[in-house]
Amino acid sequence: MQIIRDTSAINPEPSVATIGFFDGVHAGHRYLIQQVKEIAAAKGLRSALVTFPVHPRKVMNTNYRPELLTTPEEKISLLADIGVDYCLMLDFTPEVSRLTAREFMTQLLKERYQVKYLVIGYDHRFGHNRSEGFEDYVRYGKEISIEVIRAKAYTSNIEIENIPNVPVSSSLIRKLLHQGEVDLAADCLKYEYFLDGIVVGGYQVGRKIGFPTANLSVDDPDKLIPADGVYAVWVTFDKKTYMGMLNIGVRPTIDNGPNRTIEVNILHFHSDIYDKFIRLTFVKRTRPELKFSSIDELIVQLHKDAEETEAILLASKAGSNSRETK
C-alpha cells in the first residue's frame, strides 16, 4: 500500500476509491474495501482509500476526545494488511470542512486524486454539514465524470442482546468496549482489541503481595480504554507473547484514589520490563473491579483470577495482532 500525503510530489494513477475515517478498520469497513478492490480489478484501475490522519471533529473542536479504536499508525497498519493500492491521507482543515459535496468531489477526488469511480458506504455522507446524500453524489458525479456506486450493506452474523445480525459500526464497538465486552468487540473488529504503550513505574503494591505488575502508559491519549475490570490478555514484547492477567481501574481495596491505572501481571514471568514497549491484546473480561474487605481477601481472589485467566488463554489462540510490536 502506498501512503500518499502530498500529491504535488506523487501523482496517483486513476482509481476506484471510497471515503471514510475507518476507525478500527472493522468488519463493515473490510467489506466495503473488498468491494472497492473488486471493482478496481474489474475496471483495470487502482484501489484507493481517502481518509484522515486526525478525527475531523477533533480538528473542529480541540477539546473533543474521539476515543479511538485505532491510532493513526495502527489504522494504517491494518489497512495495509487488507491490500489496497493507495491510502490517500487528507488533512481535514477548516477549509476542507467548508467544501460542499460537489466541491469536495471536484477539487479533491477528481482533480487531486484522479478518482474515476467512487464507492459510497450504505450510510456514509460527506460535504459541508453532511447535508447531502447519495442521489446528490450521483448527480454531481455525472457532471464531473465520476461514476458513483452505492456499496452493498454489510450483514453481520453477530447477535447482541438477543438481536441478530447487528449492524457493525465503530460506535457499536466503542459501546461494547465501554461495557467490557471485549470478545464481542473482537467479533465486530475481526481481530482482538489491543492497547500499545510503555511500561512505567507503579506503586509496587502488587510485588509485595505476590502479583507483580507492569503498569502501562498508553501511547495515544485518545485511544479508548475498555471498562474497568479484570481481563485475560496476551502480553507481547521483544517479539514474544505471554499470558497476562490485566486490571483496569482505581484499585479500590488499596485506596488508589481517583487515579485509573492499567496494570498487568504476566503469568510465570518474573523479570523487570520497565521502559519496554508492550502490546496488550484483550481476550475476555473475567470480572468487574471489586473492593475487598482486606488485602488477604484480595490475594485469595487474585489466585482464583490467575487460574481462570490461564484457563481462558490456554483455550484461546493468540491473535496475530498480539504479535505485532514496534
What residue spans do the PLM features occupy?
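Short acidic-hydrophobic, aromatic-tinged amphipathic segments that line or gate anion-handling sites
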Residues: Q2-S8, L88
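A short acidic, often aromatic-flanked loop/helix-cap motif at beta-alpha or helix-coil junctions
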Residues: A9-E13, P94-S97, Y154-E161
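N-terminal catalytic cores of NTP/NDP-binding nucleotidyl/phosphoryl-transfer enzymes
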Residues: A9-T71
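Residue-level signal for inorganic ion chemistry
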Residues: H26, L79, L118, A185, ...
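N-terminal Rossmann-like or analogous alpha/beta NTP/dinucleotide-binding catalytic cores
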Residues: P56-I144
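Glycine-rich, Lys/Arg-enriched anion-binding loops that position phosphate/diphosphate groups
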Residues: S145-N247, K326
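Phosphate/ribose-recognition catalytic cores of enzymes acting on nucleotide-derived substrates
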Residues: G202-K326
